[in-house]
Amino acid sequence: MRAIMGCRPAFFLVCAFSVCAQVQPPATRQDNVSETFHGVEIVDPYHWLEDQSNGETRAWIDRQNAYAHALLDGLPVRVGISQRLTAMLRHDQVGGPELRGGYYFFEKRGAEEELWSIYRRKATGGPDELLIDPAPLSADHRTSVGMEEISEDGNLLAYSVRQGGEDETEIHIFDVRKRQDAGKPLPRALYQGFAWKADANGFYYTLGKRDAGRRLYYHALVPGGGTDMEVFGEGFGPDTWIAPVTSPNGHYLLIVVQHGWAKGELYFQDLSGSGPPRPLITGIDARFDPQFAGDFLLVKTNWKAPKGRVLKIDLRDLGQEKWREVVAAGDDAIDDFAVIGGKLFVNRLHNVASRISIYSLDGAALGEVALPGPGSGGMYGRADQDEGLLYFSSYTTPYSLYRYNASTGARTLWHRNAVPFESERFETEQVWYPSKDGTRIPMFLIHRKGLRPDGQTPTILYGYGGFNVSITPFFNPQAAWWIEHGGIYAVANIRGGGEFGEEWHRAGMLDKKQNVFDDFIAAAEWLIQKRYTNPRKLAIWGGSNGGLLVGAVLTQRPELFQAVVCWHPDLDMVRYYKYTKNNNPPALLEYGNAAIAEQFKYLYAYSPYERVRPGTKYPAVLFTSGDADTRVPPEQARKMTARLQAATNSDRPVMILYDTKAGHSGGTPLSKVIEDSTLELAFVAWQLGVQ
């Protein structure tokens, strides 16, 4: 039943806002540092908060956390949210099985466990065998492990060890037969790619340095270690990713080079010879995503096909004139693809829902893979294995994973998240609305069946809009709680993502980024115009690049929203390029670089931190960030919190929840995930009057 403002909710709000009135945000000192960018003087009143190790900054973080908890911990709705999220998250979860040496290797988190562990299971069936347990590594469960790659024979497992949520890890090699680590680990660093040689006598890995870029190394497994050899990367800058892929037959090393999110290159090396890696695909302004099939490469690309196509390349007979198109571009964008056994599985997005088509490796159409319904599906596997995996989820269907036989099409359930949720009570509708420039944008609305718009329904609007990321339907426990309590959960598939191909992506990057914000604002206006909700009942939610989205929108149209959740955001787009200790150089190819005069103009025009105006009635805002975010600079959230607290002229609170061990790369124990998710949802429920 929807919690509309009656006596009890009204009493709840009066009490909550009374607490807000009594508890005021901590004052923050201003230092007003002035810088000039291309003739424009910019004054930063909270520049000092960029120094993360400074004692004054640490004290500021403590005071801000105390303020946020003083407002949030006592909310009556918090207890019920915590109980419900616990019920929806405390179940066995499995991720990413990979078949090697007759065993499936996978990550698993048991219902009562805090972190993911690494297991294996015989492909023919049997019990799960625990290989790597992170529990003994730290008393507070903030040290986690992750599966990197398994050798072809299944005897050696590379796994990462991560502190908190930082991107940096150690890389360990685990001897599966001896049940112990083999040799010394690679020390803590920014590793961003790993591949075993087929004979398991060594491996390739990518080592990243934020100032110098990535380099590919080869590590031989010899007694006493030895010196790792640099294989590739000289001349590439910090705005480039490099990742190795070895062919299952042991013949080839493929090197994938990615320049931001819009351009890629491929290099390869014949491992039977002694020559260095040589160019395969270079100098083309498009992406190339490869998979091996024996001596062939199947490559998904948007070259001359903005919505994607698949090419076939014979590595024994090179030359662009020899490339063959095996899957042509169509009306729907190709999201991903898999080569399993002797077949090609192509996942297209039809109005943002998955449709998986089957082809021979020469492009003959062989039918489709039936999915449980509209939602997000996908497949993965290898060309030399007849069995792959199929997954599916939707906004009202929890995640399921199936073993899939490529020869017969037979599937068997591997795992289903046992979430207690009554899917049949709810429905998902897709609507289309015009953006500012007339572009039609799709949006999913998830709510209880039979909802009649009356302008009063509490609504959360979510978006991302960037980096070619497609926001496809997936089950979200926070959204599930929201719709169970009568709300609408809305997801706008705005430009900048990959839902409709590369043109959709590029229409939301660099100097076109304002399109993303306009699309999101138009979604809010449409929801209000069509009487689904009103500004006092509307919250927006986004993280990372989506944090930039909601940060920009709240500064451009603050009157449209009651509340904002802004998770680990990018916000100071003028100084962003100066944050060299964070993983920002590739993102400059998506956002732009304020050191370049032409790009400074549009970055300065929308940069949320520079757009804050004193005396404005801003919505309630909850920021989240943490010291361990080594990808999105946390100083941005710190500075934005202080600036909005000083500027706002409304009675709605601005606060930050700052976890010193939190970052972009997960590693958070489940109890902390539930705690953080509860506080975020309680904040929105409080502001929108939901119990």
Where are these regions (language model features)?
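Active-site-proximal cap/loop segments of hydrolase catalytic domains
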Residues: 491-691
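Beta-propeller blade signature
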Residues: 120-121, 172-175, 217-223, 267-271, ...
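Non-catalytic accessory segments flanking enzyme active sites
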Residues: 55-149, 160, 239-292, 336, ...
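Polar, glycine-rich mid-to-C-terminal structural blocks
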Residues: 214, 218-257
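Cap/lid segment of the alpha/beta-hydrolase catalytic domain
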Residues: 135-151, 159-166, 177-180, 319, ...
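Short coil/turn segments that connect the beta-strands within blades of beta-propeller domains
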Residues: 102, 153-155, 199-201, 249-251, ...
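Asp-box/WD-like beta-propeller blade repeats and closely related beta-sheet repeat scaffolds
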Residues: 128-147, 158-161, 165-207, 213-217, ...
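Blade-edge beta-strand/turn elements of extracellular beta-propeller
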Residues: 131-134, 176-187, 223-235, 272-281, ...
